[in-house]
Design a protein with these regions (language model features):
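Charged alpha-helix within mobile-element recombinases
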Residues: 109-182
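Retroviral integrase
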Residues: 1-135, 139
Length: 182
Protein backbone atom coordinates (compact mmCIF):
# COMPACT_ATOMS: atom_id res chain seq x y z
CA UNK A 1 0.00 0.00 0.00
CA UNK A 2 1.12 3.55 -0.62
CA UNK A 3 1.89 5.50 2.54
CA UNK A 4 2.35 9.07 1.24
CA UNK A 5 2.54 10.87 -2.07
CA UNK A 6 5.91 11.94 -3.44
CA UNK A 7 5.32 15.62 -2.68
CA UNK A 8 4.48 15.23 1.00
CA UNK A 9 7.29 15.13 3.55
CA UNK A 10 6.43 13.73 6.95
CA UNK A 11 8.39 13.95 10.17
CA UNK A 12 10.20 10.79 11.23
CA UNK A 13 7.97 8.19 12.93
CA UNK A 14 4.77 9.99 11.88
CA UNK A 15 3.72 6.66 10.37
CA UNK A 16 5.35 3.70 12.05
CA UNK A 17 5.31 -0.06 12.09
CA UNK A 18 5.45 -1.79 15.47
CA UNK A 19 6.59 -5.33 16.17
CA UNK A 20 7.89 -7.35 19.11
CA UNK A 21 10.90 -9.62 18.67
CA UNK A 22 12.03 -12.88 20.23
CA UNK A 23 13.09 -13.07 23.87
CA UNK A 24 16.45 -12.21 25.37
CA UNK A 25 17.41 -13.60 28.76
CA UNK A 26 18.57 -11.24 31.50
CA UNK A 27 20.04 -11.80 34.95
CA UNK A 28 17.93 -10.42 37.76
CA UNK A 29 19.39 -9.80 41.21
CA UNK A 30 22.43 -11.51 42.68
CA UNK A 31 21.28 -15.03 41.98
CA UNK A 32 21.33 -16.97 38.77
CA UNK A 33 17.67 -16.35 37.96
CA UNK A 34 17.07 -15.53 34.32
CA UNK A 35 14.01 -13.74 33.01
CA UNK A 36 12.77 -13.13 29.49
CA UNK A 37 12.83 -9.64 28.06
CA UNK A 38 11.66 -8.65 24.59
CA UNK A 39 12.63 -6.09 21.98
CA UNK A 40 9.85 -3.76 20.81
CA UNK A 41 10.68 -2.23 17.45
CA UNK A 42 9.21 0.98 16.06
CA UNK A 43 10.04 1.45 12.36
CA UNK A 44 9.46 4.72 10.53
CA UNK A 45 7.59 3.74 7.38
CA UNK A 46 8.94 6.67 5.38
CA UNK A 47 12.62 6.90 6.35
CA UNK A 48 13.20 3.33 7.64
CA UNK A 49 14.77 4.51 10.88
CA UNK A 50 14.16 2.46 14.02
CA UNK A 51 13.53 3.00 17.72
CA UNK A 52 14.01 0.07 20.13
CA UNK A 53 12.38 -0.36 23.52
CA UNK A 54 12.89 -3.06 26.14
CA UNK A 55 9.71 -4.95 27.12
CA UNK A 56 9.54 -6.82 30.40
CA UNK A 57 6.73 -9.03 29.06
CA UNK A 58 4.38 -9.32 26.10
CA UNK A 59 1.31 -8.13 28.00
CA UNK A 60 -0.71 -5.05 27.15
CA UNK A 61 0.48 -3.00 30.13
CA UNK A 62 4.13 -3.46 29.18
CA UNK A 63 3.36 -2.44 25.59
CA UNK A 64 1.46 0.68 26.69
CA UNK A 65 4.35 1.82 28.89
CA UNK A 66 6.85 1.28 26.06
CA UNK A 67 4.53 3.14 23.67
CA UNK A 68 4.35 6.09 26.07
CA UNK A 69 8.18 6.12 26.33
CA UNK A 70 8.36 6.14 22.53
CA UNK A 71 5.96 9.09 22.30
CA UNK A 72 7.88 10.98 25.00
CA UNK A 73 11.23 10.48 23.24
CA UNK A 74 10.25 10.70 19.58
CA UNK A 75 6.83 11.87 18.41
CA UNK A 76 3.18 10.85 18.57
CA UNK A 77 2.56 8.91 15.36
CA UNK A 78 -0.50 9.61 13.26
CA UNK A 79 -0.65 5.98 12.06
CA UNK A 80 0.61 2.72 13.58
CA UNK A 81 0.76 -0.46 11.50
CA UNK A 82 1.26 -3.70 13.38
CA UNK A 83 0.53 -7.39 13.34
CA UNK A 84 -2.43 -8.94 15.13
CA UNK A 85 -0.63 -9.62 18.43
CA UNK A 86 -2.92 -9.63 21.45
CA UNK A 87 -0.76 -7.07 23.23
CA UNK A 88 -1.15 -4.65 20.31
CA UNK A 89 -4.90 -5.25 19.98
CA UNK A 90 -5.37 -4.88 23.73
CA UNK A 91 -3.13 -1.84 23.80
CA UNK A 92 -5.12 -0.08 21.11
CA UNK A 93 -8.38 -0.91 22.89
CA UNK A 94 -7.11 0.24 26.30
CA UNK A 95 -5.69 3.46 24.87
CA UNK A 96 -9.06 4.26 23.28
CA UNK A 97 -10.93 3.54 26.54
CA UNK A 98 -8.52 5.60 28.65
CA UNK A 99 -8.56 8.54 26.26
CA UNK A 100 -12.35 8.51 26.02
CA UNK A 101 -12.66 8.65 29.84
CA UNK A 102 -10.81 11.96 30.10
CA UNK A 103 -12.83 15.12 29.82
CA UNK A 104 -9.82 17.31 29.18
CA UNK A 105 -9.91 18.30 25.53
CA UNK A 106 -6.12 18.72 25.38
CA UNK A 107 -5.42 15.15 26.45
CA UNK A 108 -8.02 13.76 24.07
CA UNK A 109 -6.56 15.75 21.16
CA UNK A 110 -3.04 14.68 22.04
CA UNK A 111 -3.64 10.94 21.71
CA UNK A 112 -6.97 10.14 20.09
CA UNK A 113 -5.78 10.93 16.58
CA UNK A 114 -3.63 7.81 16.28
CA UNK A 115 -4.95 5.54 13.53
CA UNK A 116 -4.23 1.83 14.02
CA UNK A 117 -3.89 -0.58 11.10
CA UNK A 118 -3.63 -4.29 11.83
CA UNK A 119 -2.24 -6.83 9.39
CA UNK A 120 -4.46 -9.85 8.71
CA UNK A 121 -4.08 -12.69 11.24
CA UNK A 122 -1.47 -15.39 10.53
CA UNK A 123 0.25 -13.40 7.79
CA UNK A 124 3.59 -12.05 9.05
CA UNK A 125 4.70 -11.33 5.49
CA UNK A 126 2.25 -8.41 5.38
CA UNK A 127 4.55 -6.48 7.75
CA UNK A 128 7.51 -6.78 5.40
CA UNK A 129 9.09 -3.43 6.23
CA UNK A 130 9.22 -3.85 9.97
CA UNK A 131 9.90 -7.61 9.81
CA UNK A 132 13.05 -6.84 7.80
CA UNK A 133 14.03 -4.18 10.33
CA UNK A 134 13.52 -6.72 13.15
CA UNK A 135 16.00 -8.97 11.34
CA UNK A 136 18.52 -6.10 11.01
CA UNK A 137 18.18 -5.12 14.67
CA UNK A 138 18.44 -8.70 15.93
CA UNK A 139 21.58 -9.18 13.84
CA UNK A 140 23.08 -5.98 15.30
CA UNK A 141 22.21 -7.01 18.89
CA UNK A 142 23.66 -10.49 18.31
CA UNK A 143 26.87 -8.93 17.00
CA UNK A 144 27.13 -6.73 20.09
CA UNK A 145 26.31 -9.45 22.64
CA UNK A 146 26.90 -12.92 21.22
CA UNK A 147 25.51 -15.60 23.57
CA UNK A 148 25.81 -13.63 26.80
CA UNK A 149 23.24 -13.30 29.56
CA UNK A 150 23.15 -9.64 30.52
CA UNK A 151 21.50 -7.44 33.11
CA UNK A 152 18.54 -5.32 32.03
CA UNK A 153 20.71 -2.20 31.88
CA UNK A 154 23.28 -3.94 29.70
CA UNK A 155 20.56 -5.22 27.37
CA UNK A 156 18.99 -1.76 27.17
CA UNK A 157 22.43 -0.35 26.29
CA UNK A 158 22.89 -3.05 23.64
CA UNK A 159 19.51 -2.06 22.16
CA UNK A 160 20.61 1.60 22.02
CA UNK A 161 23.86 0.60 20.31
CA UNK A 162 21.98 -1.59 17.81
CA UNK A 163 19.55 1.27 17.14
CA UNK A 164 22.53 3.53 16.41
CA UNK A 165 24.08 0.96 14.05
CA UNK A 166 20.86 0.42 12.09
CA UNK A 167 20.05 4.14 11.88
CA UNK A 168 23.59 4.94 10.67
CA UNK A 169 23.36 2.80 7.56
CA UNK A 170 22.97 4.46 4.15
CA UNK A 171 19.42 4.40 2.82
CA UNK A 172 20.44 4.48 -0.82
CA UNK A 173 23.21 3.13 -3.02
CA UNK A 174 26.62 4.73 -2.49
CA UNK A 175 28.89 4.58 -5.50
CA UNK A 176 32.62 3.90 -5.18
CA UNK A 177 33.31 6.05 -8.26
CA UNK A 178 34.71 9.47 -7.28
CA UNK A 179 33.35 11.04 -10.48
CA UNK A 180 29.80 9.84 -9.79
CA UNK A 181 28.07 12.72 -8.00
CA UNK A 182 24.52 11.39 -8.18
Amino acid sequence: FRIVSENVRLKAFDQCGIDAASPYYVKVGRGHAQHKRYMLLFTCLQYRCVHLELLSSLDTCSFLLAFERFIARRVKPSRCVTDNGLNFRGGEKELREIWNRFDHEQIREKHSSIEWWFNPPASPSMGGVFEIMVKCCKRAVTTIIPNHTLTEEELSTAFAMAENIVNSRPISYISNDVGDLE
